[in-house]
């Protein structure tokens, strides 16, 4: 029983750890670890390059992420492309890890069935992932009722046949860097919609969907929340706010609502944008809200534009942490010494993936490049054993 429990805990951290649970410093193919930072400074994709980094703040890393590049179909080798996923969990890592394990396989299955990539394929992959996690919660309800209160934001980008598909639940963000030919500037263009009750239009959407509930959104401690509980209005998981049969005992009382509900309080329907890539589209930044809490869209784009590609995701993480330290009137070097768990009081888990577009391969993928299947994160250090992490100069 103990060994099974240890295996479960180990799986929460992802594949970037060694079998013995020691941090992996080498192996560029699988990424590197340095203290609470995991990073992959550079890699090749079907139609471009990427840089990826994750820094942990929570005691258990709740951000999960992946980059998949190569065949997007199980039956058609000519359907090539890239998927980037950023899954910002809340209440625990289980939902984010489940998405990491299942969404891409669902997407490949539906792409094979439809013989193409489309918004409908992505929507079906989201729905199948949501339904699969519901099944897990239902099967473990009597033993692990707390799974009903775990959820995750879900940001997915798919690059295929000259199109960029952005699908989102929650408040992670995808920001495009687009060149302005006349001036040479690179401007930020946010492609993802955010689902957070802090936005008035999101609150109006909720109120319109629940006209019989005057308390669907509540201002609590100066923060707007759905039923006074959660800021996110769309997610995978959070079954206790979507199905009333899971908002009762044996779920802990702090998650249970006093009144029942007839319709799901949160949605799992992704907002999807289809963007036809242009030669002026330089790169796109995918990141959890841990980055955007500290850096604006344009600041992030400027940083990417004016620095080397190699290690740029790490550089963005550093910039966010520097701002977090500044807000608390402390030195960045001191913030790096704070261990996971306590670190969450200063900043959230942060995941960043930057994809650079190869303009020559936007419409014709470079199939000679090897397939990529990479997951971010994987820090498995014992408490109080940090080593400083480095940032490219």
UniProtKB/Swiss-Prot annotation:
One of its GO terms (cellular component) is membrane. This is Probable protein phosphatase 2C 72. GO terms for molecular function: metal ion binding; protein serine/threonine phosphatase activity. Coiled coil: none annotated. Belongs to the PP2C family. GO terms for biological process: regulation of intracellular signal transduction. It is found in: Membrane. SUPFAM superfamilies: PP2C-like. Its main location: membrane. It is an enzyme of class 3 (hydrolase).
